[in-house]
Amino acid sequence: MLEEAGEVLENMLKASCLPLGFIVFLPAVLLLVAPPLPAADAAHEFTVYRMQQYDLQGQPYGTRNAVLNTEARTMAAEVLSRRCVLMRLLDFSYEQYQKALRQSAGAVVIILPRAMAAVPQDVVRQFMEIEPEMLAMETAVPVYFAVEDEALLSIYKQTQAASASQGSASAAEVLLRTATANGFQMVTSGVQSKAVSDWLIASVEGRLTGLGGEDLPTIVIVAHYDAFGVAPWLSLGADSNGSGVSVLLELARLFSRLYTYKRTHAAYNLLFFASGGGKFNYQGTKRWLEDNLDHTDSSLLQDNVAFVLCLDTVGRGSSLHLHVSKPPREGTLQHAFLRELETVAAHQFPEVRFSMVHKRINLAEDVLAWEHERFAIRRLPAFTLSHLESHRDGQRSSIMDVRSRVDSKTLTRNTRIIAEALTRVIYNLTEKGTPPDMPVFTEQMQIQQEQLDSVMDWLTNQPRAAQLVDKDSTFLSTLEHHLSRYLKDVKQHHVKADKRDPEFVFYDQLKQVMNAYRVKPAVFDLLLAVGIAAYLGMAYVAVQHFSLLYKTVQRLLVKAKTQ
């Protein structure tokens, strides 16, 4: 039998019997000539940043899941159920996001451009409006953000092409394309998120003591340092509130120089406070006030507070607004500061539009509008200075708030307006006859734009979400060191959520590694199994009826020779 098989094989090779040769040699040829899939194309690993997940006042916000293991699709696909929906920021809309959630998508991955500063302004404004709505809608769908690279962009385009072809083809074409197309399985490396216990929110304070008796009035200058956006690891908070912290540090530098000399040492205590947890209902400020007003007998906040100035989002725009919960009465120091702000803006910077915005505190809201409301609740005169007219402006809580959104000249100008107005109040310069158009900070005492820029660069070089800044972070130690250069008694204050009834709860798994594996669909395995079964069936029939096959081949060979 083996000799006969060898003879048949030899005759097939000599006579080039195409049908049988095709059947016998095709599988081996395909295995030999098929190029192996490059490792880079077979799998791609990239970093993803999860959407916010936190509880505030017992109310859950953001996404509640972190685990992802499902096949990729784009919005062009008709069926999104249990699929990882890829979206590019430039094509993103809230309607598409809601559609993916309604269809029970397995996950959503939003691809961000590499250079956020180059994103068109209309796209930036639209996404800033969408972010609060995304967070307000609690969802069980994992939502991730990824920064675009060439491999990820290629994955998106291939997935988009496959999704689009399925929606516009016939059933047979869809089946064929589904069987032959390449898909991508998206898998995260982390585990399910869980609550972080005993998380501390840290704040930093420092002071400049006034010259004179013990019962000197105190001016408090406050700015919260933490940033907020739809994804904590992408929250740089340049304007909100890196600009406020930059101004606070520059004011500390300027007044520390004035308080160094007896001739310019004013009869006011200056208390500087860089608060944490500002984006979470000002938790750092709340605990700081409780510690100073309820749990101690010696505090500058208990004695004689002239007013509290909160700085929030002052790095761009051509206007400044002083937000108050109660309009200041004439004859008070806070009213004098309001008038000095108006005077400096009108005479030294006429291009700046200044106004006072009055808004009552709404205790029915889960989150206070502005930081000064924390002080107003404790009956301390306070206001917030910002270039934003409304606390609902999306610029206060967006991952789009990057370094390029802060204009250096505008930040320097606003710092000068604040410093000039404070100085005129503290030293009573208007009553002493100083012309309103005469600047105080000139020559060696002028505002340093380079200093403001370097601080802004440092602040926006790292995410400052409250979930990422612990008490031992390099950011806090650097901030504390910076304040120690100019102020006395610099120290940290910590707030930890109550275990029984926590006001805030943070969750982990905010940054993960995601793998995109190139895979064939399940129907491809089915068709492949059918093809293999058919081939094996043909081979089985050929072996079982080898004598018939042998005679047929001989007859064909004889006919070929006679011709």
From Swiss-Prot:
Swiss-Prot/TrEMBL keywords: Endoplasmic reticulum, Glycoprotein, Membrane, Signal, Transmembrane, Transmembrane helix
Main location: endoplasmic reticulum
Lumenal side stretches: 43-522
Any one GO MF annotation of this record: ribosome binding
UniProt signal peptide: 1-42
Transmembrane segments: 523-543
Tissues/organs with expression: Highly expressed in pancreas and skeletal muscle and, at lower levels, in heart.
Keyword Membrane recorded: yes
Subcellular compartments: Endoplasmic reticulum membrane
BP terms from Gene Ontology: determination of left/right asymmetry in lateral mesoderm; multi-pass transmembrane protein insertion into ER membrane; negative regulation of nodal signaling pathway; protein stabilization; regulation of protein complex stability; regulation of protein-containing complex assembly; regulation of signal transduction
Positions annotated with a glycan in the UniProt record: 241, 428
Coiled coil start-end: none
GO cellular component: endoplasmic reticulum membrane; membrane; multi-pass translocon complex; protein-containing complex
Keyword Signal found: yes
Cytoplasmic side: 544-563
Family annotation (InterPro entries): Nicalin (IPR016574), Peptidase_M28 (IPR007484)
UniProt topology in membrane: Single-pass membrane protein
Subunit record text: Component of the back of Sec61 (BOS) complex, composed of NCLN/Nicalin, NOMO (NOMO1, NOMO2 or NOMO3) and TMEM147. The BOS complex is part of the multi-pass translocon (MPT) complex, composed of three subcomplexes, the GEL complex (composed of RAB5IF/OPTI and TMCO1), the BOS complex (composed of NCLN/Nicalin, NOMO and TMEM147) and the PAT complex (composed of WDR83OS/Asterix and CCDC47). The MPT complex associates with the SEC61 complex.
Family: Belongs to the nicastrin family.
Function according to Swiss-Prot or TrEMBL: Component of the multi-pass translocon (MPT) complex that mediates insertion of multi-pass membrane proteins into the lipid bilayer of membranes. The MPT complex takes over after the SEC61 complex: following membrane insertion of the first few transmembrane segments of proteins by the SEC61 complex, the MPT complex occludes the lateral gate of the SEC61 complex to promote insertion of subsequent transmembrane regions. May antagonize Nodal signaling and subsequent organization of axial structures during mesodermal patterning, via its interaction with NOMO.
Name of the featured protein: BOS complex subunit NCLN
UniProt organism field: Homo sapiens
Higher taxonomy: Eukaryota, Metazoa, Chordata, Craniata, Vertebrata
